[in-house]
């Protein structure tokens, strides 16, 4: 009996989405041959809501291993809005269930991050056959040691830090580099260590601006004419850590320095140390381009494992890597949870041993 398998990509794009789609498809065709049909849901959950999907053929999955982005398109559809009926009077959950039924799907694979997994769990609870695949450059999905897209983003952010070193040294500047990661600092921590940042500021560890400035001044006294500060976009100071998120975000907006801490840190460092300070924001560059060799392998592992789950009809789960082994977690166990950098993380110990300031 034929199985009809839906695939969607949701949330922010990242390297490895197409490689994972390919891994799923090639493994399904290899294992099930003509007994599988693949349906592409376009533009994430938006396509599932609006009934926007297309029949896929084996040809659609050729030549996409190295391709960045996603051939299915993606869109952010916040989980908090899934049960909210807006001006268009569309019941989103009912609409998604209808599309699933209209497309005659036997199961749906959802590739995405934390928000995607929350909606995937919701659909699973509503009775749909769902399998998740963990995608995010933030590496913050609970229950898996790594997500596809993360290692490529580390490579990109590291190259930015590498290149900033030469201009910082040439101009005797402090350079603040803003790295993606709103709730978790994995990307900043890894790229900061790999790129030789002198100060690394993470969302999990509220910083004291005086300690940041002291670290810059210590380097200057030891003969260094520049410093590199890697700042996670979700970094906050000790005062903000005591406040509700919406309150400190509003306070930042009122100050006219943007919603991230980077500009304010740069301004304070220049004022307190007297050293010329600049900000570099690589932004969406960290999401773009071809996946690294590591992410291609990981995506293929995850995709082929998801195909196995389809074949054995194991639903309500998401793929994970735990202690070097590809496995699965129940969606209900991981949805709505964030994998943060723990205080006991070995890389934090490494950073401290190396004299890196953590704020």
Predicted regions, residues:
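Flexible loop/turn connectors
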Residues: 302-311
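A cross-family phosphate/adenosyl-ligand binding-site feature
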Residues: 1-9, 20-104, 115, 237-242, ...
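Short glycine/serine/threonine-rich phosphate/pyrophosphate-binding segments
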Residues: 14-24, 48-49, 93-94, 105-121, ...
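Alpha-helix capping and helix-loop boundary segments enriched in small/acidic/polar residues
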Residues: 12-15, 87, 114, 144-152, ...
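Accessory alpha-helical/coil subdomains and C-terminal extensions
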Residues: 99, 110-112, 120-122, 129, ...
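Glycine/threonine-rich beta-strand-loop-alpha-helix active-site module
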Residues: 25-58, 126-163
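Short, ordered loop/turn segments at secondary-structure junctions
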Residues: 10-13, 41-46, 76-77, 113-116, ...
């Amino acid at each position: 009996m034929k199985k009809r398998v839906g695939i969607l990509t949701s949330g922010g794009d990242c390297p490895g989405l197409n490689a994972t789609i390919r891994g799923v498809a090639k493994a399904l065709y290899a294992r099930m041959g003509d007994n599988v049909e693949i349906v592409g849901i376009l533009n994430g959950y938006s396509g599932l809501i609006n009934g926007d999907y297309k029949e896929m053929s084996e040809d659609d999955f050729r030549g996409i291993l190295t391709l960045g982005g996603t051939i299915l398109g993606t869109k952010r559809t916040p989980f908090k809005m899934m049960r909210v009926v807006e001006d268009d009077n569309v019941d989103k959950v009912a609409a998604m269930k209808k599309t699933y039924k209209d497309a005659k799907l036997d199961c749906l694979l959802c590739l995405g991050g934390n928000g995607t997994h929350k909606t995937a769990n919701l659909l699973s609870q509503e009775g749909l056959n769902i399998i998740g695949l963990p995608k995010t450059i933030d590496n913050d999905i609970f229950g898996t040691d790594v997500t596809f897209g993360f290692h490529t983003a580390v490579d990109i952010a590291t190259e930015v830090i590498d290149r900033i070193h030469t201009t910082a040294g040439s101009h005797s500047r402090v350079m603040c580099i803003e790295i993606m990661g709103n709730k978790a600092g994995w990307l900043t921590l890894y790229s900061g260590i790999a790129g030789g940042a002198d100060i690394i500021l993470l969302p999990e560890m509220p910083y004291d601006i005086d300690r940041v400035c002291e670290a810059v001044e210590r380097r200057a006294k030891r003969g260094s004419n520049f410093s590199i500060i890697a700042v996670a976009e979700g970094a906050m100071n000790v005062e903000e850590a005591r406040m509700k998120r919406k309150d400190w975000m509003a306070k930042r907006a009122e100050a006219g320095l943007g919603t991230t801490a980077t500009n304010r840190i740069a301004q304070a460092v220049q004022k307190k140390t007297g050293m010329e300070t600049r900000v570099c924001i690589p932004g969406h560059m960290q999401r773009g381009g071809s996946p690294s060799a590591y992410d291609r392998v990981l995506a293929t592992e995850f995709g082929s494992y998801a195909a196995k789950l389809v074949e054995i009809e194991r639903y309500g789960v998401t793929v994970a890597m735990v202690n070097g082994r590809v496995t699965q977690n129940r969606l209900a166990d991981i949805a709505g949870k964030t994998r943060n950098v723990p205080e006991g993380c070995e890389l934090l110990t490494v950073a401290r041993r190396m004299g890196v300031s953590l704020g």
